C-alpha cells in the first residue's frame, strides 16, 4: 500500500460516509461505513486477497462524509451504478429474465425487453417470456394501450390492431383514453390489480342486465383468461399481498415476486462474496427490480431504514402467509443449489470424458435447419455453467441452392468465430461428419477449440473421430441432450419464420400490381400469409393504397 494512502486512512473521519479507492483516477472499489475511520483501518491489515489487492492497486483514496448511514448506503449504490468498479461485487444473472417497458415517449408504447436501459418505466423481472406475452396480450385487449413503435405524427390511418379492438388508437387522436389505459397498466403491474378485475366484473354484469349476452360473454372470457394467465405461475394467495421474498446461501440469491396475491416470478442471481445488504443495493437501488411494499427476509438487518427507498417493511415474516412464502423461497433455493450441484458434476464428468484442459464453463451449440436445402438457417445457443444463457443466443441465415449440412456448419463457424471469442467447448448437432466440418472451419480461420457432437439415432457422443456410448441416465449425456434439444428448437423456430416470410414473398410475386414497395409494406405489416388471410379488404387496401389490388391479394390467397 502506498504511504500517502496509509496516511489518509489514519486521518479518516469518524463520521458515516463513502470511500473510493482509485487507480489512475478510475474507481476500483467503492464502499460505505458507519464510521469511516474504523472501516478504512481494516485495509491496513488485510484479511482477504481482495482487500489486499485493492490496497496494492490503489494510488488514491477519496472519502465523502454524509449525515447518516442511510445516506451513505444510497450514495454508495449510486456511485457503484455510475462507475461499476472492478472489485465491487456484482449480480450475475443465472438466466434471462424479461421486463415490461413503458416507453418515455409523449405517447408511450409498451414492449417486452431483455434488460433495463433507463429510458422508460420498467416492471419485472419476470420468470417466463411466454407468461409476459400472454399477460400483455390479455391486458391490451382490456385496456387498449399501443404496442407499435411507429411515429404517430406520420400515421394517417390506424393499424389493424385498432380495427381488432386491441388498441384505442392514439394515432387518430384518442390521446386521453390512451393516457388512462397507460395509467391502468402502471397500476396493474405495480400490484394494484383490483381496479382491472372490478372493471371487468362491472362490464360483464352491466351487459348481462341489458341482455347484451355477446358482450357480457366477452368480458367474462377476458376475466377468466386474465385469472388463468396469472394462476399459470402456480401459486395464488387469498390475501392481496404485494411483496418480494429474498433468501440466499453461499453466492446464490433467490427472489420470489408476489403481486396482488399472485406469484409472478421466481428469479435467481449469483453474487460472489455478497451479503443481503449488497444484494438490496445491487438489485433494488440500482433499479434492476421494482420495489414492492414489503421485502421478507430470514432475519432483521442491522438498524438500516429502508423506508426512504420505497419499502414499507423489510424484515422477517409477520404473518402465517409471509412464513409460508419464506418456506417456499427456501425450498426453491434448495432446489437451485441441488441443480447447480448436479450440473457442476455433469460438467466435471464431461471435462474428464473429453480430456479437456479447461473447465467447460461456456458451451456454444450449433444446429442447421432447412427444407430440402431451402430456407437454410443456423442456430447458436449458449450454456454457461450448465444453464442456458438466452440473451447470448444468435441466429444465422445461410444462402445455398442445395442441401449441404457440412458446408452450412463451416459457414456458420467461420462467421461466428472470425469475430467472436471461442467458447470452452463447441457442440454440433450431428455425427462425425458435422464435427469434422466444424473443426475444418476453425482451422481455416486459424483457431482451435474442442468440438463435440451428438449423433441423433442412438444419441452417441462424437469426439475426435470416435464414438462414445454412454448409459441413457449418464449426467453427461443428459446435459448434451439438453443442449442438442435447445439448438434444434431454436433453429426450427427461426426456420419456420423464414419459410413463412419467403412463402409470403413468393405468393405476392404472383399478384398483378404488387411491386417491391407494396410487397415490403405487406410483409412488414402482416408478417405471414395467415395474417393477411384473416385481414379485411379495407385493412389490406389501407396498407397498399388500392382496393382493387387488395381484392386481387385476397383472391389469390
Swiss-Prot record:
This is UvrABC system protein C. Pfam families: GIY-YIG, HHH_5, UVR, UvrC_RNaseH_dom. It is found in: Cytoplasm. The UvrABC repair system catalyzes the recognition and processing of DNA lesions. UvrC both incises the 5' and 3' sides of the lesion. The N-terminal half is responsible for the 3' incision and the C-terminal half is responsible for the 5' incision. GO terms for molecular function: DNA binding; excinuclease ABC activity. Belongs to the UvrC family. The gene is uvrC. Residues 14-89 form the GIY-YIG domain. Interacts with UvrB in an incision complex. One of its GO terms (biological process) is SOS response. GO terms for cellular component: cytoplasm; excinuclease repair complex. Residues 194-229 form the UVR domain. Keywords: Cytoplasm, DNA damage, DNA excision, DNA repair, Excision nuclease, SOS response.
Amino acid at each position: 500500500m502506498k504511504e500517502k494512502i496509509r496516511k489518509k486512512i489514519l486521518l479518516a473521519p469518524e463520521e458515516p460516509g463513502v470511500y473510493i479507492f482509485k487507480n489512475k483516477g478510475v474507481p476500483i472499489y467503492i464502499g460505505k461505513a458507519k464510521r469511516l475511520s474504523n472501516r478504512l483501518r481494516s485495509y491496513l491489515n488485510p484479511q482477504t486477497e481482495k482487500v489486499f489487492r485493492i490496497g496494492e492497486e490503489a494510488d488514491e483514496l477519496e472519502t465523502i462524509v454524509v449525515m447518516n448511514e442511510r445516506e451513505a448506503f444510497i450514495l454508495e449504490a449510486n456511485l457503484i451504478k455510475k462507475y461499476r468498479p472492478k472489485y465491487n461485487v456484482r449480480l450475475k444473472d443465472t438466466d434471462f429474465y424479461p421486463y415490461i417497458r413503458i416507453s418515455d415517449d409523449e405517447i408511450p408504447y409498451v414492449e417486452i425487453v431483455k434488460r433495463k436501459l433507463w429510458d422508460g418505466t420498467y416492471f419485472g423481472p419476470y420468470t417466463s417470456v411466454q407468461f409476459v406475452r400472454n399477460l400483455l396480450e390479455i391486458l391490451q385487449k382490456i385496456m387498449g394501450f399501443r404496442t407499435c413503435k411507429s411515429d404517430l405524427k406520420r400515421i394517417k390511418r390506424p393499424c389493424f390492431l385498432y380495427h381488432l379492438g386491441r388498441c384505442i388508437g392514439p394515432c387518430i387522436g384518442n390521446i386521453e383514453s390512451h393516457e388512462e389505459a397507460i395509467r391502468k397498466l402502471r397500476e396493474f403491474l405495480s400490484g394494484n390489480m383490483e381496479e382491472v378485475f372490478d372493471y371487468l366484473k362491472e362490464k360483464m354484469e352491466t351487459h348481462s342486465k341489458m341482455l347484451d349476452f355477446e358482450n357480457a360473454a366477452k368480458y367474462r372470457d377476458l376475466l377468466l383468461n386474465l385469472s388463468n394467465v396469472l394462476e399459470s405461475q402456480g401459486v395464488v394467495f387469498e390475501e392481496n399481498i404485494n411483496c418480494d421474498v429474498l433468501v440466499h446461501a453461499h453466492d446464490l440469491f433467490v427472489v420470489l415476486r408476489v403481486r396482488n396475491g399472485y406469484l409472478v416470478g421466481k428469479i435467481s442471481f449469483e453474487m460472489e462474496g455478497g451479503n443481503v445488504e449488497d444484494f438490496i443495493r445491487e438489485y433494488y437501488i440500482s433499479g434492476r427490480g421494482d420495489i414492492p411494499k414489503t421485502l421478507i427476509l430470514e432475519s432483521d438487518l442491522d438498524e438500516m431504514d429502508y423506508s426512504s427507498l420505497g419499502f414499507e417493511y423489510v424484515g422477517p415474516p409477520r404473518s402465517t402467509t409471509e412464513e409460508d412464502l419464506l418456506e417456499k423461497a427456501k425450498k426453491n433455493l434448495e432446489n437451485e443449489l441441488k441443480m447447480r450441484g448436479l450440473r457442476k458434476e455433469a460438467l466435471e464428468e464431461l471435462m474428464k470424458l473429453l480430456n479437456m484442459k479447461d473447465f467447460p464453463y461456456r458451451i456454444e451449440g450449433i444446429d442447421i435447419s432447412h427444407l430440402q436445402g431451402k430456407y437454410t438457417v443456423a442456430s447458436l445457443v449458449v450454456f454457461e455453467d450448465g444453464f442456458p444463457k438466452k440473451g447470448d443466443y444468435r441466429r444465422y441465415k445461410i444462402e445455398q441452392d442445395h442441401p449441404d449440412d457440412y458446408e452450412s456448419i463451416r459457414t456458420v463457424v467461420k462467421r461466428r468465430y472470425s469475430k467472436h471469442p471461442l467458447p470452452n467447448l463447441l457442440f454440433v448437432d450431428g455425427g462425425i461428419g458435422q464435427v469434422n466440418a466444424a473443426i475444418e472451419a476453425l482451422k481455416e480461420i486459424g483457431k482451435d477449440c474442442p468440438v463435440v457432437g451428438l449423433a441423433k439415432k442412438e444419441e452417441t457422443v462424437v469426439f475426435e473421430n470416435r464414438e462414445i456410448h454412454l448409459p441413457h441416465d449418464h449426467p453427461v449425456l443428459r446435459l448434451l441432450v439438453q443442449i442438442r434439444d435447445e439448438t434444434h428448437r431454436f433453429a426450427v423456430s427461426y426456420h419456420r419464420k423464414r419459410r413463412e416470410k419467403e412463402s409470403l414473398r413468393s405468393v405476392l410475386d404472383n399478384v398483378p400490381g404488387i411491386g417491391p414497395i407494396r410487397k415490403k409494406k405487406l410483409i412488414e405489416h402482416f408478417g405471414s400469409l395467415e395474417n393477411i388471410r384473416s385481414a379485411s379488404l379495407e385493412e389490406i387496401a389501407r396498407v397498399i393504397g388500392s382496393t382493387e389490388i387488395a381484392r386481387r391479394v385476397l383472391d389469390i390467397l
